[in-house]
Amino acid sequence: MMEGVTVHPLKHIVVPKGDIYHALKSTDEGYVGFGEAYFSQIEHGAAKGWKRHNRMTLNLVVPVGAVKFVIYDDREGSPTCGQFEEITLSPESCYQRLTVAPGLWMAFYGEGEGISCLLYTSDAADERS
């Protein structure tokens, strides 16, 4: 796994009237503070990125559909500099959260049928939004 990228298994609780999907607790590994949270949708076959956050740690969860994340490390001095990492998140296969450290490039691709939805949480608010 790339330095600065971690994947954390999450709880998916099946209940008769609608399932519960955990996302992030302040006691979870990968949580470094709260700045903002928002949802983003992506259509099947669409790609978004490349984007790099220099100060934010991102925690990403896909509760609907499937999204492939491609991460690139160009951080000078990093043991994984020059490497790519691909990780697909989906509630259907091993529901988990992706944590991405500051300074890494990231793009993502909609792999689920129809529209996929992802939850972004970060430790700092994006001042542009």
What positions do the PLM features span?
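A short, N-terminal "cap"/entry segment at the start of jelly-roll beta-barrel domains
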Residues: 1-33
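A short Gly-Trp-Pro
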Residues: 1-4, 47, 85-89
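Conserved short histidine dyad/triad with adjacent acidic residue
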Residues: 39-54
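Glycine- and acidic-residue-biased ligand/ion/polar-headgroup-sensing regions
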Residues: 57, 62-68, 73-74
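The conserved catalytic core of RNA pseudouridine synthases
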Residues: 76-78, 83-94
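Conserved metal-binding segment of the jelly-roll/cupin
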Residues: 90-111
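Conserved small/polar residues in nucleotide/adenosyl-binding loops
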Residues: 120-125
